[in-house]
Amino acid sequence: MKANKLSAITLCILGYAHTVYAESNMQTEKLETIVVSSEDDSVHNKNVGEIKKNAKALSKQQVQDSRDLVRYETGVTVVEKGRFGSSGYAIRGVDENRVAVVVDGLHQAETISSQGFKELFEGYGNFNNTRNGVEVENLKQAVIQKGADAIRTGSGSLGGTVSFESKDARDYLIDKNYHFGYKTGYSSADNQKLHSVTAAGRYSDFDLLAVHTQRHGNELRNYGYRHYDGSVVRKEREKADPYKITKQSSLIKIGYQLNDTNRFTLGYDDSRNTSRGTDWSNAFTSYNGGPFLKDVRHTNDQSNRKNISFVYENFDTNDFWDTLKITHNHQKIKLKARLDEYCDVNGEIDCPAIANPSGLYINDKGIFLDKHDGEITHKKEGEFNNYFDSKGKEVRVKGFNVDSILINCDQYDCSKPMQLLSSTNNGYGGSPNKYIYKTYELFEKTMNNGNGKYAVLEIRSSGHEKFSRVYLPSEKGYVENQWKDRDLNTDTQQYNIDLTKSFKLKSVEHNATYGGLYSEVKKSMTNRAGYEAYNRQWWANIFFGKENNKPNKCQPYNGNSFTTLCSHEDRLFSFLIPVKTKTGALYVTDKIKLNDKVNLDVAYRYDRIKHDPKYIPGTTPKLPTDLILGRFIEFKPKNTYATQDEKNENAEKNAVYLASKKTKFSANSYSATFSFDPMDFLKIQAKYATGFRAPTSDEIYFVFQHPSFSIYPNLYLKAERSKNKEVAITLHKQKSFLTVNLFQTDYKDFLDLAYLKKGSLPYGNGGSQLETLLYQNVNRDKARVKGLEVNSKLHLGDVWRTLDGFNLSYKLSLQKGRMSSKVGEEGKQRDTNKLDTPMNAIQPQTHVVGVGYEHPQEKFGVDMYLTHASAKKEKDTFNMFYDGKDQKDQHIKWRSDRYTLVDLIAYVKPVKNVTLRAGVYNLTNREYGTWDSIRSIRPFGTTNLINQETGKGIKRFNAPGRNFRVNAEITF
């Protein structure tokens, strides 16, 4: 019924549109352009296949992240990755690395897209394998290109492109010499607090822009967040995991206007995002109850981006250019996933290693006392020795030999004696043990390893009795923290030259752009792991023990040979060989105006990409030995039993061999758009464009060896390619328009992980072999996506002046897509060339209806959006892990249901320099989950899990219920 109601609304808008368009008198407009920006932008300025939002539109819609950017768009969504947040976009049936993300002309970090790597590591939360985001307050403009378009961005633009352009001082200093702005806001969905300061100024020939933004918030609170039991852990947890999220960004640009035609700009862009929390839903999380130690997974994930840029612009018109722009960028991106596993749930309650319920301590005089400042006493009950505080409550202490206890003089003033509960050793046939407080002198000594001072305990004269034991807390006094810190690094150096030239040949007008780029991108991985004695209590700081009868400050007095008070870090290692990717590109475009009714836009680009891996033994982070042992160079130990040194040497040789194999790719990309305006109110357009994605270095070089699953490199992969065809009809008048667009995008040479055969691995002694299953990345799939998109906006003032300021809008996206399936037994599979396998990245049918009003002088405005998404049908999903055995269902069991949302956003300007904005989202408090969120659920691993049988835990993937957002901005 809801879908039918939406259809009625659609017919209403189209009916209005027909009346308007029949009388229209418009200039040329381009195909399927969706512009959500200021109302002053005319329809004919929209570009082919774009969604364009400027800074004003972003503020009006209260956009704070990538999800908000596409909230009211159809045919483009955000990829979800659970704990790590979002990861790029999904357009035309493909996602992540197949949709280019660009900031100021620079590609952002790509995910490690090798399916083998994803299966081995991504499902366990070991890596922050996402695409970094961008700070909205820094943006001048965001442009989303639907469909293949390699002309703009080169590799990666298989299904589309999302590009961002940062602000410049000139954006604020058009008619004044200074600007200051401050924005503050709050979002209830994630408890986010926003503070942003913008300052711009001009002095003489110099200008400056500085934007600093801070966001402090928490996890996105799913529907019903407050009512779910927070003590439930692992895959059946319904409540979102708790995180504290901090985002800080600084954008600085200094410009120097040498003269009217020459300008230099130096830029600095630094963004740091941190998310700290507890991974309660992870399958490795210990239960709160039971006798086991409560080791908790503490996450500390980061996404950091820093770019330093230099830009030279020239506006001297000559035979070669009207404008010239030369740019150099140095960008560094680090995506970090850190995990610390230690107990701190409820301090002493759940962490017995640091429990001290009696409040035992040593006072300023060196006396060992309880929390009541009383002494500890002993009482023998049957065969057991028990110890009590001054109030008669049992105390956890244990006796240790005096000779085994040492004092850390770096933590305790060893000039003072100690009074400790002590006992004689007169049992076993002699007199009963005596338990009394004795005073010990401390004699300082120097550690042989230079690690500070220590002291031994020597009892003051006590007659013939020998006190050989002292009593100290029995608990370890520290929590063991096993930590892992894994970074994915992308370091880019890029040079661009871009030129424009307008000219006329006979009666034909040409607006040409041309140029090129050269970039070097270094991609690497660093894995660090180690141990630390975390949350050390006083007794673990003051006392220590011996190892092999020698003083060792790393040895707990109450531990064993497997425990330590000292932190250590393992050797740096990596699962990937570092690779430098060199890219060179040349491009040319020409917007040709043949006459007043016919326009032709043509473009060509050539890309050449070279992967150059580097591995230097002893310098490059080491690949784990077993990962590559004997893969290319046979392992032949000298003796029957191989030594570890021999294995390491062979592994290093294999890594060097793999790194010697360079790979190259080249691509020719084309784009052509034909526009015909047979009448003043009608435009007909046809577009053809191509895109490609060169294999990433990890898809080529990733190697992994294990008896149950081995992946071998493939140096002969081809680039993925796409062809996009569109036809559109646009009716328009003044600011009102209706565009109906039919499109088809064909993909081929999709990269996929394929089973090859059974193989063998070197194992144990020199002649032993172990069977394994061999996999490899290959090109094989082809795919096709077809669809219909409608985009319309009716300004009622174009129909009736009395309704000036009111507007209606409607958007629709309907897509269907299939890729070729595989047949045959493992190792002999082939494509059927039949497009019969669903593509999961395609969104269900989506409608967005908008009703709005804006005051003619922009003193206030209000917009209401109604979004309806259909349910994701079972037949339109594909279980990529389907094998007919362990995974018997070839479709995805858990899918998104249909939902309808209502959002209300308003703003008011009480005075010229102040703007107040507020929005209520999911006004009807609907419980729902988006398809992108639901499809992030994994069937195996440890993260993003639910109970696949009952569905328990799926509510954790729901979107927020009713929530609000407010902000205030002041400008001068």
Curated annotation (Swiss-Prot):
Q: Where in the cell is it found?
A: Cell outer membrane
Please verify whether the record's keywords include Ligase.
no
Where is the secretion signal located?
1-22
Enumerate the PROSITE patterns for this protein: TONB_DEPENDENT_REC_3
Q: Which PANTHER family match?
A: HEMOGLOBIN AND HEMOGLOBIN-HAPTOGLOBIN-BINDING PROTEIN 1-RELATED (PTHR30069:SF29), TONB-DEPENDENT OUTER MEMBRANE RECEPTOR (PTHR30069)
Family as reported in the entry's similarity comment:
Belongs to the TonB-dependent receptor family. Hemoglobin/haptoglobin binding protein subfamily.
What is the recorded name of this protein? Hemoglobin and hemoglobin-haptoglobin-binding protein
Q: Which organism is it from?
A: Haemophilus ducreyi (strain 35000HP / ATCC 700724)
Chain's gene name: hgbA
